[in-house]
Each structure stands twice: as structure tokens, then as C-alpha cells.
């Protein structure tokens, strides 16, 4: 939210250290701030990204401005100091003063992120869609895919000693977690949920493990910001909204059998 009055990127980075006790890996430098925020410098690829339109639909990628080059070089060195330790091969090249490629740096950032060694920090403004494109790229480059995540574990209500697990696979029984419930003026109660395993068709019944009741999923909606799309089928990894789950609440487990998830 660097376009907001009072926005201070350096202060926010320091807050991550002071308040969250986390180690930031700063990937961007903002170009301008508040009303003058126009773009970011990508410290991984050492390029400047500037947005010319208010809706963020068009942007230019160019060399770093001369007046920011020294700062960018200094901040990139700080970034390399943080991320190089995440990968032995990268660390060896770093200590040997060999030039690290973009692929080397991205590899180290991803490995360190997955292992919880540090937290990537990016700059932007979602309201005007500045930097969001780079954020989406970072999600793909650095965050875990379903294959990187361990199986979800849980138990049958009333039998907590018998731990069960579900892999992130379409072949396992259906399981999902309701993480948001809202009232929609057009379709009524909407239950947002993330599918951890299995598949489900529109009209199928699911068991709410909190209430023990079965409910029929009348509609499945894929949400696109301010629009929605009706779909007939979902599988592991999907995040959707369901219509017809009258008793669902935030935090409920939805399953084709009574299974309550703990992690």
C-alpha cells in the first residue's frame, strides 16, 4: 500500500524484524512513495518496473535510474547476504566471489522460503495494481506447490488417538476446510473453502465434522474478484465458494466422512 499517505517501506521492513521477529529478504526497492509511488526496482533481476496508468494495466521494464543505482547495488548485496546461506551451492559461489545468476538467487530464495529461514518482502500497491504482477510471479517462483507440502493430518471426532492423514491427491477421500463465510445479496450464504484432497461434484453431499450433519452442495462458484463462475467439479488444491451449506462456519472441516483436521 505504498500509495497511501504515510507509507514508509523501510519502517515496514523494520517492523517485520521488531514485531514478528522474522528475517526479511527484501526483493524490491520502491520508486517514490505515497502519491508519487510509480514503481519498484527488482533486486533479483536488477530492473526497474514503472507503471504509467492508474489501473496498472501497462508498465515498463527498464534499466535502474542512475540516481538509484548505488542504493540498488547496496540493497542487492544485503539481499545476497541473507539468501545465499539457504543453498550450499549458491553459498560456495558467493564466498568465491563468483557472479550469482538470477537462477541461482531465485533458487536460494525459494529454498530459504520453504525452510522458513526468511520471509520475502515485496513492494507495491494493490489498489492501483502496481507490483501485483511481480507478486504473482513471486508466488510461483518462491512459495510451495502442493507437492512441497506434507500430508494434512486429523482424526475422527471422538477418536483422537487414531490419527488419519490425507495427501494432496484427487485419489484420496474428499476433505476441505471452510475459511470464510459471507452473506451474498444474490445467492445467500457463501462458504469459501479450500479442497485438501479428493474430488467433488455439484450436488454431492458433504459431512460437516463440527455438526456431524450432511449437507448438499447446491452450487460451486469460482470467484474472480467482483465476478463469479459456476463450475460442476472441483479437485485437490481448488479454492472455491459453495452455496447450500447452511450450517457451515469458519474453521469447519468438510468431508465425505467424519474427519476433523488438526494441521
Predicted regions and their residues:
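Structural and coupling elements of P-loop NTPases
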Residues: 1-263
Amino acid at each position: 500500500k505504498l500509495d497511501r499517505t504515510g507509507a514508509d517501506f523501510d519502517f515496514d521492513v523494520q517492523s517485520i524484524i521488531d514485531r514478528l521477529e522474522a528475517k526479511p529478504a527484501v526483493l524490491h526497492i520502491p520508486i517514490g512513495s505515497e502519491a508519487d509511488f510509480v514503481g519498484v526496482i527488482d533486486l533479483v533481476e536488477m530492473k526497474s518496473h514503472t507503471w504509467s496508468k492508474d489501473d496498472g494495466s501497462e508498465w515498463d521494464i527498464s534499466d535502474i535510474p542512475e540516481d538509484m543505482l548505488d542504493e540498488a547495488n547496496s540493497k542487492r548485496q544485503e539481499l545476497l547476504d541473507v539468501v545465499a546461506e539457504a543453498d550450499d551451492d549458491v553459498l560456495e559461489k558467493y564466498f568465491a566471489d563468483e557472479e550469482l545468476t538470477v537462477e541461482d538467487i531465485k533458487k536460494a530464495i525459494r529454498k530459504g522460503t520453504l525452510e522458513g529461514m526468511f520471509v520475502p518482502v515485496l513492494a507495491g500497491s494493490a489498489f492501483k495494481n502496481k507490483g501485483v504482477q511481480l507478486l504473482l510471479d513471486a508466488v510461483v517462483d518462491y512459495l510451495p506447490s502442493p507437492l512441497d507440502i506434507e500430508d494434512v493430518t486429523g482424526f475422527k471426532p471422538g477418536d483422537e488417538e487414531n490419527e488419519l492423514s490425507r495427501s494432496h491427491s484427487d485419489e484420496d477421500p474428499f476433505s476441505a476446510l471452510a475459511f470464510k463465510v459471507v452473506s451474498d445479496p444474490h445467492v445467500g450464504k457463501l462458504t469459501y473453502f479450500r479442497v485438501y484432497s479428493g474430488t467433488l461434484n455439484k450436488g454431492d453431499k458433504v459431512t460437516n465434522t463440527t455438526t456431524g450433519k450432511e449437507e448438499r452442495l447446491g452450487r460451486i462458484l469460482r470467484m474472480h474478484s467482483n465476478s463469479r463462475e459456476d463450475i460442476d467439479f472441483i479437485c485437490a488444491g481448488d479454492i472455491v465458494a459453495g452455496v447450500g451449506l447452511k450450517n457451515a462456519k469458519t474453521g469447519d472441516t468438510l468431508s465425505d466422512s467424519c474427519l476433523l483436521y488438526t494441521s
